[in-house]
Amino acid sequence: MKYGILGTGGVAQVIGDKLIQLGHEVKLGSRTANNENAIKWAKKNGKNASYGTFSEASAFGEIIFNCVKGIHAIEAITSAGPEHFKNKILVDLTNPYIYNDGHISLDPRYSGSTCLGEEIQKFLPNTKVFRQ
């Protein structure tokens, strides 16, 4: 199976590593096509590992993992192109936290009657959004 992963940080790489170990093809996506973390990760993981932009990763994946910081989740999906998510499963691993000078706080946009997962589902109505 082919998986696209939005993000190149620790969570994205751990998920990608395991999927590669299980014999799947994985493409890490970032804002830019030449992200150093993604390049190193792909070299380490061999022929089933690749990298590209958010758009390339989301187009590639039959299932997509969203592993960007929560404050960038909608922005990353917008950059990827919502059309690439249609009729697919999005596993959303984002958290709506803001990290600032060693302090963690909840993003005020998601501290009321809505949560980040709900906002992503509204943004992608033809996608099955799975929250951890």
Regions found by a protein language model. Name each.
Residues 29-31, 52-54, 132:
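Conserved beta-strand termini and adjacent loop/short-helix elements that scaffold enzyme active sites
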Residues 1-44:
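NAD(P)+-binding Rossmann beta1-loop-alpha1 motif at the extreme N-terminus of oxidoreductases
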Residues 46-91, 95-103:
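Rossmann-like NAD(P)-binding element
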Residues 43-47, 108-110:
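Short, hinge-like loop/turn segments at secondary-structure boundaries
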Residues 89, 93-132:
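Rossmann-fold NAD(P)-binding glycine/threonine-rich loop
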Residues 17, 21, 78, 122:
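Short, well-ordered alpha-helices that flank and scaffold nucleotide-derived cofactor binding pockets
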Residues 1, 24, 49, 88, ...:
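A structural micro-motif
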